Design a protein with these regions (language model features):
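N-terminal cap/lid segment of alpha/beta-hydrolase-fold proteins
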Residues: 1-30, 243
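Short beta-strand element of the alpha/beta-hydrolase
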Residues: 32-40
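The serine-hydrolase catalytic nucleophile loop
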Residues: 41-54, 215
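Catalytic nucleophile-loop/oxyanion-hole region of alpha/beta-hydrolase
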Residues: 73-98
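Short beta-strand immediately N-terminal to the catalytic nucleophile in serine-hydrolase-like folds
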Residues: 105-107, 135
Length: 265
């Protein structure tokens, strides 16, 4: 059974210089731990993977929350004003309000980075998630996969004009890379820091991912020496991992993690 989209009203955020806004979400009732979907950069909660995972949770009687960040999908906003800090705040707001006890966070691409940042914040509050599924986790992507790889002329355009419109492999329309996006994200970089997440992590990665290369993810995994980490590699998988066989693997991994967490509790 489908779940209707609802809107969560948020007040003016003077710190982020945001007007009052609404975040769109779909919250499926069911058993704990809830599965919470954290989408990727410029993706939304109606994506193939998010929808398939919601359908699997419906079959299992499992609670599932998915939502759109500010200026994504059904959540209104000016993408030029959006930053990683805003999207992290959105995720934390949703998890705190609707996540229930010890949810499982499923983060795709940028959502993987946000899942890690959110976990650190939630642990400090004594309400950590019970596990993470990370799909092609784009940790520190704004700095290492964007800024560090941009030619000098593009960097200068971003610094001078405040924005550069990047051609998209997934859309006919280019999308804005803003100076505020790059500079704000620097306070959230974690790859050069000791990382100890403290909950089980399962990573799903395509070996032929051109956007978040497997070598990049291997580097991230090597920094998680103190954590319980599993990794499933799809040899011919790309970044999206949205083929039926990829979706089946994601659903299986998520179900297995939930089952193992329930057995251990």
């Amino acid at each position: 059974m489908s779940v209707e989209t609802q809107l969560l009203g948020l007040p003016v955020d003077a710190r982020r210089q945001l007007p009052a806004r609404q975040l769109a979400y779909r919250n499926r009732a069911g058993d704990a731990p809830a599965v919470i979907w954290l989408g990727g950069f410029r993706s939304d909660m109606s994506s193939t993977k998010a929808t398939a995972l919601d359908e699997a949770c419906a079959e299992d009687g499992r609670a599932m929350l998915r939502f759109d960040y500010y200026a994504h999908g059904e959540s209104a906003g000016d993408f030029h004003a959006a930053t990683l800090s805003i999207w992290l705040d959105d995720a934390l707001e949703m998890i705190r309000r609707f996540g229930g006890p010890a949810p499982v966070l499923v983060g795709s691409s940028m959502g993987g980075w946000i899942a890690l940042l959110a976990t650190a914040r939630l642990k400090a509050e004594g309400r950590a998630p019970s596990g993470l599924v990370l799909i092609a986790p784009a940790v520190d992507f704004t700095e290492r996969l964007m800024w560090a790889r941009f030619p000098e002329e593009i960097r200068q355009k971003i610094l001078k004009d405040g924005v550069w419109y990047r051609p998209s492999a997934y859309s006919p329309e280019p999308y804005p890379i803003t100076r505020s996006l790059i500079e704000d994200a620097r306070q959230h970089l974690i790859l050069d820091l000791p990382i100890h997440v403290g909950v089980p992590i399962h990573i799903l990665q395509g070996a032929k991912d051109p956007d978040v290369p497997i070598q990049y993810v291997d580097q991230f995994v090597s920094s998680l020496s103190k954590d319980d980490v599993s990794m499933t590699i799809i040899p011919d998988g790309d970044h999206r991992l949205s083929r039926p066989e990829d979706i089946a693997t994601l659903v299986r991994i998520t179900r297995e993690l939930v089952q193992s967490l329930r057995a251990a509790s």
